[in-house]
Amino acid sequence: ASFDEAPPGNSKAGEKIFKTKCAQCHTVDKGAGHKQGPNLNGLFGRQSGTTAGYSYSAANKNKAVEWEEKTLYDYLLNPKKYIPGTKMVFPGLKKPQDRADLIAYLKEATA
């Protein structure tokens, strides 16, 4: 199912998901350094593999996807299927509500 059919996202629930599943490798804080994964500040509207100062896989750079709700919704279902060769070792979020919630949080937290 596509993002058009996704349930409304709850950013508070999304923040909990971020803290438990994403924060060990990513930060959303402006000006913060990269962790194991890139800083996600300014994520929306950015092309994959282009954050300054982070060493991306060739797969991530070559995918050249623009991050927005729709692309993140598909990516977060199964990152390794969406970008084969990605360095991200996250299995994905299978539940549409979890993906919608996380995206709602990221939209606020990375702006």
Curated annotation (Swiss-Prot):
GO molecular function: electron transfer activity; heme binding; metal ion binding
Keyword Cytoplasm: no
PTM comment text: Binds 1 heme c group covalently per subunit.
Gene3D superfamilies the UniProt entry points to: Cytochrome c-like domain
Subcellular location: Mitochondrion intermembrane space
Function: Electron carrier protein. The oxidized form of the cytochrome c heme group can accept an electron from the heme group of the cytochrome c1 subunit of cytochrome reductase. Cytochrome c then transfers this electron to the cytochrome oxidase complex, the final protein carrier in the mitochondrial electron-transport chain.
Family: Belongs to the cytochrome c family.
Stated name of the protein: Cytochrome c
Lineage: Eukaryota, Viridiplantae, Streptophyta, Embryophyta, Tracheophyta
